[in-house]
From Swiss-Prot:
Zn(2+) modulates binding to host coagulation factor XII (F12) and high molecular weight kininogen (KNG1). Suppresses activation of the host plasma kallikrein-kinin system, leading to inhibition of the intrinsic coagulation pathway. Blocks host coagulation factor XII (F12) and prekallikrein (KLKB1) reciprocal activation without affecting their amidolytic activities. Blocks binding of host F12 and high molecular weight kininogen (KNG1) to negatively charged surfaces. Attenuates generation of bradykinin by interfering with activation of host kallikrein-kinin system. The lineage of its organism: Eukaryota, Metazoa, Ecdysozoa, Arthropoda, Hexapoda. This is Triafestin-2. GO terms for cellular component: extracellular region. GO terms for molecular function: toxin activity. The keyword Glycoprotein applies. InterPro entries: Calycin, Triabi/Procalin. It comes from Triatoma infestans (Assassin bug). Salivary gland (at protein level). Disulfide bonds: none annotated. It is found in: Secreted. CDD domains: lipocalin_LTBP1-like. It comes from the Eukaryota.
Length: 206
């Protein structure tokens, strides 16, 4: 088990001190057949369940956008750091990869809007196990920390929804993928619900 002082996108670490299972490298499960990268990488996705992490993990929301020729994942939100909760901006730029059965690869930057010294760069890999694109997705994602943070790996499996208030039949997804969400942390268990993000005018995405 490792204790890491960092806060990472996609629920890799939702608080400053977090124990995750130790892994030596990313172990991606098989990607869904005929995965359509373009359809997945558009619009908003909300994390509703997570194998590892905290309430912040299952409160994560992110969106995809195109900036010129680049595909960008935006994961702005609240993260815990040094005993407090702070708002961070997150930008993940997709690296070129046209092979549908290969993990989606991104290079990411996460930084505090109040303290420029709180900035982290990391590599992200994503494999989609299953999705209908319009309602839900099951995603395995793995992060490689930079050398200054130990050069190790952390992974997680997430259940995503387009609308966190309109959930699919999880039993069907479990049977299809031969997995169980029983031990996963759920957005529905967050006391008082997930916090609202600041207005876009106050924290305009760059």
């Amino acid at each position: 088990m490792k204790t890491i002082l960092a806060v990472i996108f996609f629920g890799i670490l939702a608080f400053a001190f977090a124990d995750y299972p130790s892994i030596e490298n990313c172990t991606h499960p098989p990607a869904m057949a005929n995965f359509n990268q373009k359809k997945f990488l558009e619009g908003k996705w909300y994390v509703t369940k997570a194998k590892h992490g905290s309430n912040s993990t299952v409160c994560r929301e992110y969106r995809a956008k195109t900036k010129g020729n680049d595909q960008i994942l935006v994961g702005d939100g609240y993260y815990s750091f040094n005993g407090g909760t702070f708002y961070f901006t997150v930008r993940c730029k997709r690296l070129p990869n046209k092979e549908v059965q290969k993990p989606l690869q991104f290079t990411c930057t996460q930084k505090s809007t109040d303290d420029p010294s709180k900035m982290f760069k990391f590599q992200l890999e994503v494999t989609i196990l299953d999705t209908d694109y319009a309602n839900y997705a099951v995603m395995y994602r793995c992060v490689q920390f930079p050398e200054q943070l130990g050069s190790h790996f952390e992974d997680n499996t997430l259940l995503l929804h387009r609308n966190p208030d309109q959930l699919v039949d999880e039993n069907q997804v479990e049977r299809k993928l031969n997995l169980s969400f029983d031990s996963f942390r759920s957005r529905e268990d967050v006391v008082d619900g997930c916090p609202k993000l600041p207005s876009k005018k106050k924290n305009k995405a760059s």
